[in-house]
Amino acid sequence: MAKGLLIVNLGSPVSPETKDVRRYLREFLSDQNVITMPKALWQPILRGFILPFRSWRSATFYKHEWTQAGSPLIAYTQVTRDRLRERLPDWDVQMAMNYGGEYPIGETLQTMAARGDAPIVVIPLFPEYTQSTTKTILDKVAASGVKTVVIDRFYDHSDYQKILAQQIDDAYEAGAYDTVILSYHGIPTAMVRHGDPYQQECETTTAGVKQYLKKVPQTKVEMCYQSKFGPVPWLKPYLRNRLMELAALGKRNVLVATPSFVADCLETLEENNVQNYQTFRANGGKNFATVRPMNGCEPFCDFLAKLAKDKIAAEANHGKA
């Protein structure tokens, strides 16, 4: 009987073709943990307006970033899984995706359980907890009926914060930057008002990373939110707006890190490296660079392996108490 580890990421269309992107967006944007509007109101908007117009546009972006290995997010999650297998040779290490049809959470867990894996540790690859990512994963884990041990966030682990800080220091040293921005995926402010801890956890991540930075002056570090969707207010400051403000203030050299994304995806590759880069340059900015996400790097995989082993040890000690 082997211990099991399941890492879970958001997911991706199975191809960059419009029909597959439409199917993916329909699944993703129909999740009421993501869009909390009543279905009777939301579904006509989604099917009548958003999917017909957004699907082909998003498909264009996916085609820009698609690789021979497929979706970058899935490819880098596979790298993470494979490196975890090297670090945990006696474990059954698998990956799952929340949306998109490939690597379904429930089926993957049931297969692991049928092989006799016990206990099974589940790690959603989202450092900070929020309803629209972590909770929807945990709902599917619970619905599988498989007994699991869940690590639902890891933003406050010093080892994780040190890895982030080292990545930022390394990128900062390669250029002369006026400002370093830690940019997180945004969520609607209504979620925070209803008790979602995400904003506080992002702020804690930023504070933790700042204390481990060795080369970046803390006065140069700030945080923003990106990837706003729809007309309702989301967490501010918005990254795009802040980039325009910085350029207007003469801060023409900016480095952006994205702690809430552990693998490259449309938000890092298209939104930041293309759209936000173009916005910054069009408003007078000069140098715009990004810090690559973890992308299955060795230190991050070391961290995840230790996280899983420590969780099992803690559960065993708790059972003896």
Swiss-Prot record:
Cited SUPFAM superfamilies: Chelatase
Example GO BP: heme biosynthetic process
Keyword set includes Cytoplasm: yes
Keyword Metal-binding belongs to the record: yes
Stored PROSITE patterns: FERROCHELATASE (PS00534)
One GO CC term on file: cytoplasm
Main location: cytoplasm
EC number: 4.99.1.9
Binding residues for Fe(2+): 185, 267
Listed GO MF terms: ferrochelatase activity; metal ion binding
Pfam families named among the record's database cross-references: Ferrochelatase (PF00762)
Protein family (similarity comment): Belongs to the ferrochelatase family.
Record-given protein name: Coproporphyrin III ferrochelatase
Protein source organism: Lacticaseibacillus casei (strain BL23)
Organism phylogeny: Bacteria, Bacillati, Bacillota, Bacilli, Lactobacillales
